[in-house]
Amino acid sequence: MSNIKAVLFDSGRVLNGPVTGHWFITPKFWDYVDKTVFESIESSKIHFAFRKADEYINTQKLITTKEFELECFIKFYEIFSNSLPELKLTNDKINLIANDLVYNPDKYVFYDDALKVIPELSKRFKLGIVSDAWPSLLDVYEKNNFTQYFDSIIISSIIGTSKPDSTMYVTALNKLDVSSDEAVFIDDSLKNCLGAEEVGVQSYWLCRDEKQYMLNKIKSIGKKYRVINSLNDLKKYL
């Protein structure tokens, strides 16, 4: 693939993941939520609470500042709290959790392969991020000195749409000044990979789970997209 000039990456579950293991359980979540009470609640009820809050945040397509992001996540945790009255979350605690989600740049941790591969690839290609996320994601990259490796960072809430809308990929290509056949895209979602394929970008479906990787590798036979188990696998294709 000698004509490749740019590599586009999803962020979450590709380059980094939540330090707590859950996107909306923030690093200081247990400072404000009684863990014993939380763990005594049926998991189905907890899933429902997060799902209701998630339904709300997904309606907020355009979030261009961290200030508005905070407003939205205060509402998010209010909805979450209303579904779980057992937690007895006060308005102050709700505000503190939301603040932790928006203003704590240590909420995500970068994967080992990302820490190794990204600096290497940045020497050979233009790199871009195409992520369904909010403005605070930029702080995570800045805190980890990772913005230096990327020529473009496209965040869905800032442009008002999300993957697999073609606007996400086309905006990234335009920012990097490359054509679709000069770029590749890596995501942990097949749907998003297929969205990239629709605009002519070769995609790589990242499956970090070994069993899922093996299964999806077999299913990908004859398909345009490729399946990889690690970012290290990119080296044999680029």
Regions found by a protein language model. Name each.
Residues 1-51:
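Active-site neighborhood of HAD-like aspartate-dependent phosphohydrolases
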Residues 1-7, 17, 119, 134-238:
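Asp-based, Mg2+/Mn2+-dependent phosphohydrolase catalytic module
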Residues 24, 28-32, 45, 52, ...:
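Alpha-helical elements of Rossmann-like donor-binding domains used by nucleotide-donor carbohydrate transfer enzymes
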Residues 42-51, 91-103, 201:
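Short, well-structured alpha-helical segments
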Residues 52-98:
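A metal-dependent, Asp-based hydrolase signature
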Residues 54-68, 105-112, 167, 202:
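Short amphipathic alpha-helical segments at helix boundaries and their inter-helical linkers
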Residues 71, 89-91, 99-128, 166:
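Short, acidic loop-to-helix structural element flanking the phosphoryl-transfer center
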Residues 131:
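Conserved phosphate-coupling serine/threonine residues in phosphotransfer and NTP-handling enzymes
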